[in-house]
Every structure is written in structure tokens, then in C-alpha cells.
Amino acid sequence: MKLLFNLEYQTTFGEELMLNILTHGVGAESPSASANNVEGPKQSNGDVVARHKMSTADGLHWSCQLTIAEKDCSCIDYYYTLVRGDQELRHEWLVAPHRLELAANKGARYTIYDHWNDIPEDSYMYSSAFTECVAARRCNQSVATDYDRTVRIKVRASQLRSNERLAMLGSTEALGCWEALGARTMTEHSCNEWVISLNADVLPDTFEFKFVVLDEENDVTPVWENGMNRTICLPPMEKGEVVVYELPQAWFPVYPWKGAGTVIPVFSLRSEGSFGVGDFGDLKLMIDWCDKTRQRILQVLPINDTTNTHTWQDSYPYNAISIYALHPQFCDFRQMPAIKDEAIRNHYEQLRLELNALPQIDYERVYDAKMGYLRQLFQQEWGSVSRRESYKLFFEQNKEWLLPYAAFSYYRDLYGTAVFGEWPEEATLAAATEHPSAKAKKEMQFWYFVQYYLDMQMHDAHNYARQHRVILKGDIPIGISRDGVEAWVEPKYFNLNGQAGAPPDPLPLEMNACLPGCVWNATPRSLSPLERNIGFWTQA
């Protein structure tokens, strides 16, 4: 099977275009382009990029022909880059690469006409807040066709809601002769990109058409796209030929999406079933309220662990000791196994009722009570939890931050302070993780146990929000705690002698957050999650 990619892009002397094929998964084969095949980089998600040089006769019209085995793959994702020698000058928007589906059963030669895709003005519509929540729709592969000659039309349309779909209406009988009832429904084969296959044998050489939006739930008049009719002039086509047109984005006369929402700290969501403080179970109740009041955004204040002094001062949510770990106070005991010992269970139930009846949250009593409950559960459940496949997967995926966090928490409680500069020299990460004492190992396992349940409950609340089409929006501090895990493990990235905050504004107020600043000229070497994050922000 032959694939001929075409792109119009004006270049200057010395510049070249490259076609970059993404091969998903280990061992995937890349299409062959003989001597023009160049080894490319590996993406952060594990995809391998195979680069192919394109050719041109005028510096404007670029093309590249590839050959693949007919059963090698069902679709190809790719993007274009502009290079000068070994230097990459720019590349397309990588969030939504081009997708070519090999959906024509009789297709032996594909001719693809693309256009360069920069970051669109509505790029936010490609975020998970829309594609997986507010405007979530199921993407599907195109149905295979048996046409002798096939025309495939692709277009991006990001304004559609979850109950809407894209269709084509045109001047030919195959496209409904401009009658709404004859509109041809398209397939969303990737987020916000729609495609349709047409039988070229029943199409005239030139035809006009427009894209329309259909409502799947209500029988209403289709919404027609803005602008003049689109026109396609088909080239001569032989049997087995497929021509693919990627068209400019479709825009419709609809208002931009707007959503109302609420900002709230999770600890304030105390309900009748709480344990003296709002938790991740109560977060679901708040999501229900947002949905019933037609709010689409729920922003929560930071939910990271702030346990520093074991006093009420730890209630400040913007001084987290870890940028990853969640606060133990948000554990919902209703979603965890019950304590089997009846006397202990009744004790904590009475304590729960007492703490829940307080007019204000007693941070210290609630924290101590919930930690005592969690330690009882740990003694009871750790043996079975540690053997679960879900726990093993959680630990493997998060051990880069989980081990330092557990070690830090162990030392903090052992020495009675989170100021790691006051710990003895032997209190190192290596000592706690490589050759721990029995006590240290048990204590660190407790923190693994707590974070495992917190992770499950937070994921459950997040999925619940998506099911109700409520965007669960987070909040983060402006920096790390000077007495936290990151400062302890990787101090080279932080100015621990400085303090960051907010400068005065027109109201001549300022705020000293007492957080250390970042050392931005430290070279990230991708040796840890924090270093990768710094690399991302400095390169963004």
C-alpha cells in the first residue's frame, strides 16, 4: 500500500519539512520511505517517532511517499516539523496530531492533502476538562468501506456539546441535495476531529457542501457552519485509490462555552457522615449539588499533606510537605473496611459523633482521632492490602515520590520536628529505604497504606465528577515548603535562604508566603519527578 502525503508550507532556502510518524507501543513498525527514513526522538508517552524527509520543487508544495504492508496498522498518527540541517525550527501542535485511518477495504493508494496545524485559538476545548467531562463524546474508528474509489474528508470542530454530532450537507444526492434530512453523519475518530468516507463513483468532479451540527436528543434545525459553501474538485482517480482531504476547522454561530462554579476547601464539606472534617466522600455530595444547580466547575483548595507541627497551624493548605502526597484527614472511613473489634469501633463512633457536633473544626483532635483510626485499620488490613494487585500497581507507579514521603514522615515523627536540618546526619533517604530497621519499615508501610486509600478515594471522586459533567479543578501553592520532602531530597533546586510571596498590588498590600524560591538555572537532568516538572516549566 502506498501513501502520498502532501502539504503546502512556504519555506526559505535551507529549510526542509519532515513527516513524523508516531509508532505506538514497543516493536511497532514504521512505514518505509527508503533513503529518506531518519531515526527520530522518543516521545514522553513512549511513542517512537520515525522521521521521513519530504521533497519539494518550489519550496511551497511538499510531499513524501511511503510504502506499508496492507495489514501493518489500521491508522497512523503523525505530525510535521520544519528543520534546518539538524536543528528543528518549529513543529505542529502535538496535542492533536494528524490521524490517517486506512478504512478503505479496496484502498491500495492513499493521497493525503494536509495543512499545517498550529495551536488553535480554542485549544482549551482539547483539554480533558472538555474532552473527558463537559463535552465528553465517545471516539470511534471509521467503519470500513468497500468503494472502488474513496474520498475521505476530515475536519476539526471543537464547539460541539456532548449531545451533538457533525454531519455534511451538499449539492449532490450523496450529500442530501441541501435537505437537512439527507445530511450524512460523520464519525469522531479522535477528539474534536470528524471524518467521513464517500463513494467517489457517485460524486461529480466538483461539488459544494457545508458542515452542520445535529442534536441527538432534540429534533431541532441543524446549525450550519459560518462562511461560504466549501468546494472540492476531485482529481482523476483509479480503482483502489483513496483521496483524503484535511479541511480547515469548521466554525459555527454559537456562543463560546461559559460555566459557573464554586471554590471551596474540602475540609469545610462536613456532612452527617463525616468524622469531624470534610473528606473525599463529602466531595461527592458537593458534586451532586453542583450538578443539580447546573454548575459545571468545582474548584477545591490544595489537598496535599501539610503535617508539619501536628498543631492547628498545619491547617493552612498552602504549606504542603509534599507536592504529591494527599492529606490523611481527607480519608473517608465510610469507604474503608470497618474495625472488627466492637469496643474499639464503638469508641471511634462516639468520638466521630462528638467531633462532628462541634460548631467549628477542631483540627488537632480530628487529626489525632483519624490517625488513630487509620493505625487501627493498618494493623487489621495491611496483610491483605499489601497482597492486592491494585496496591502493587499503585506502589510501582508512585514509588518515586512515595518512598521519600514515607521516609520524611517517619523521621518527622521520630525526631519530633519537620525541620530536617535538626535531624542527625544518619537520617538520610538511603538509610530509610535501603536498610531500614523493622520499626522504620513498618512505619513507612503505614504511610504507603494511607496514601493508597487516599489515592483510590480521590480517583473515585474525580470519576464521579466526570460522570456528572462537573470539572473538578485543583489549586496548588506558589512553591514548596522549606520543611518538606522536596527541600529535603533535592535542595539544589531551591533557595532555602530566601522567601517568596506576592508583591504589592494597587491596594499596596503584599503577602510573604515564607516559601523558598526556585533556583531556575539548575540544569534539569530528568532524574526524578520533580526534575522532570522543572524541566517542563522552564521549557514551556
Label for each model-derived stretch:
Residues 2-8, 150-156:
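A short, amphipathic beta-strand motif
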Residues 8, 22, 156, 171, ...:
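Structured loops at beta-to-helix junctions and adjacent beta-edge loops in soluble globular domains
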Residues 10-74, 83-105, 157-204, 214-237, ...:
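Aromatic-rich carbohydrate-binding modules that target alpha-glucans
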Residues 107-149, 158-161, 238-270:
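Compositionally biased low-complexity segments at domain edges in trafficked proteins
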Residues 226-254, 281-282, 297, 306:
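Extended acidic/polar, glycine-enriched regions
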Residues 253-491, 527-530:
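Acidic/aromatic-lined carbohydrate-recognition and catalytic surfaces
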Residues 443, 476-479, 483-539:
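Non-catalytic scaffold segments within catalytic domains of secreted glycoside hydrolases
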